[in-house]
């Protein structure tokens, strides 16, 4: 079909990417390298190796990489420094994983001499954009193969027929007690799409949720947790310092137990359509609330407001696939600069789906001055008479406008 010699496929070992693997071999007559990323999705990844071997992939062309620490340290934490939320709700669990997968695919392509990369994203979704913008940003001349935009296997029936014809194992997981939904998981979240969720008027079934108990079934006793931050990043939980991915895993455990982090939303995809999805982001929900709390005591007011103004733009960059763009990197530099003083601890209370901040402090960088903020006698620390001139000057433009309106009648 083309002069592609070797292609690196983002390979999960599931039905779709297994069909893609065989299709690449048959259609492009090229050597295939498989790459499977461990992002903390909680699945056994060794079967992906065994499946690749059955397709004739050379052992040296099978890559299964543990990227959990890099994912949280270099992608999730930088995003949370900006308090990033897309369209007021979505914590970008899928979006933030794609730049890392693309990065590693390109690294493998360079190491193995591959001239092409391939992914399993459909032509309807955001992931095709996220993957491919990453590929081109990191390796401008790379050939990109997107099977869902090329082949004629455009229905589930055709995909299954192709798999059966070529001896590809068909795992009907939902018949074995698994999920019938299209799912994506990593350490930050798990998402659910498809089936009856395509009807936005239908409530999600309780049996769908994997990581969280329902708030109604959560413990009747609240749990207090202390979180410590350094330069905007979480470094310890209840005094225990852990690696970045271990911290997020611990927050997921705590949040899941208390029914925290469920989300059912209709989002605006970059390609133009609206899509309904359900998400569980227990650890991320806790982290966002706690990070905003420590910022509230350590950030200057105008800096905090500037961050809030810029955050929706930053969120759109990540959602739409522009992680590797110069504008995202420039904005990240600004965000990271603001985090130099975001040091301290936050105490939260977890209770039946709620994350409640109950205390926060910073020994080194707190801007909260109790001698000024007190409602008691401040011993002259704040001269209330100064407020008169402050108010009159701020009212000047409105007084001028009112006078002009009076003259006009």
UniProtKB/Swiss-Prot annotation:
L-citrulline binds at residues 90, 95, 126, 130, 182, 191, 267, 279. This is Argininosuccinate synthase. Keywords: Amino-acid biosynthesis, Arginine biosynthesis, ATP-binding, Cytoplasm, Ligase, Nucleotide-binding. It is an enzyme of class 6 (ligase). It is found in: Cytoplasm. Disulfide bonds: none annotated. Its main location: cytoplasm. It holds the Pfam family Arginosuc_synth. PROSITE patterns: ARGININOSUCCIN_SYN_1, ARGININOSUCCIN_SYN_2. GO terms for cellular component: cytoplasm. Belongs to the argininosuccinate synthase family. Type 1 subfamily. Its EC number is 6.3.4.5. The lineage of its organism: Bacteria, Pseudomonadati, Pseudomonadota, Betaproteobacteria, Rhodocyclales. ATP binds at residues 10-18, 37, 120. The keyword Cytoplasm applies. GO terms for biological process: argininosuccinate metabolic process; L-arginine biosynthetic process; urea cycle.
């Amino acid at each position: 079909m083309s002069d592609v010699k070797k292609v690196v496929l983002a390979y999960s070992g599931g039905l779709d990417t297994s069909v893609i693997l065989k299709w690449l071999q048959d259609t492009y007559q090229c050597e295939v390298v498989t790459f499977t990323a461990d992002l903390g999705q909680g699945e056994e990844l060794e079967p992906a190796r065994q499946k690749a071997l059955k397709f004739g992939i050379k052992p040296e062309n099978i890559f299964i990489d543990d990227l959990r620490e890099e994912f949280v340290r270099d992608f999730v934490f930088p995003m949370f420094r900006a308090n990033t939320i897309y369209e007021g709700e979505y914590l970008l669990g899928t979006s933030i994983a794609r730049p890392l997968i693309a990065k590693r695919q390109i690294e493998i392509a360079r190491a193995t001499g591959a001239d092409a990369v391939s992914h399993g994203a459909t032509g309807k979704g955001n992931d095709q954009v996220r993957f491919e913008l990453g590929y081109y940003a990191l390796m401008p001349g790379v050939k990109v193969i997107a099977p869902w935009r090329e082949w004629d296997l455009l229905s589930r029936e055709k995909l299954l027929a192709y798999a059966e014809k070529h001896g590809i194992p068909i795992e009907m997981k939902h018949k074995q007690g698994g999920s019938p939904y299209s799912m994506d998981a990593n350490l930050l979240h798990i998402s659910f799409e498809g089936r009856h969720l395509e009807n936005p008027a239908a409530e999600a079934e309780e049996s769908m949720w994997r990581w969280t108990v329902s708030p109604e079934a959560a413990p009747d006793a609240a749990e207090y947790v202390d979180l410590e931050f350094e330069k905007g990043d979480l470094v310890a939980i209840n005094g225990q310092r852990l690696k970045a991915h271990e911290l997020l895993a611990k927050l997921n455990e705590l949040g899941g137990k208390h029914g925290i982090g469920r989300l059912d939303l209709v989002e605006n995809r970059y390609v133009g359509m609206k899509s309904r999805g359900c998400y569980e982001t227990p650890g991320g929900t806790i982290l966002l609330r706690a990070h905003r709390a420590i910022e509230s005591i350590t950030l200057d007011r105008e800096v905090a407001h500037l961050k809030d103004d810029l955050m929706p733009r930053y969120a759109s960059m990540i959602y739409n696939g522009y992680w590797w763009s110069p504008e995202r990197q420039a904005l990240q530099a600004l965000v990271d600069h603001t985090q130099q003083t975001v040091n301290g601890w936050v105490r939260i209370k977890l209770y039946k789906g709620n994350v409640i901040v109950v205390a926060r402090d910073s020994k080194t960088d707190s801007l909260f001055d109790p001698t000024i903020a007190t409602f008691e006698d401040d011993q002259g620390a704040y001269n209330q008479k100064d407020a008169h001139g402050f108010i009159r000057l701020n009212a000047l433009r409105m007084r001028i406008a009112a006078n002009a309106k009076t003259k006009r009648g």
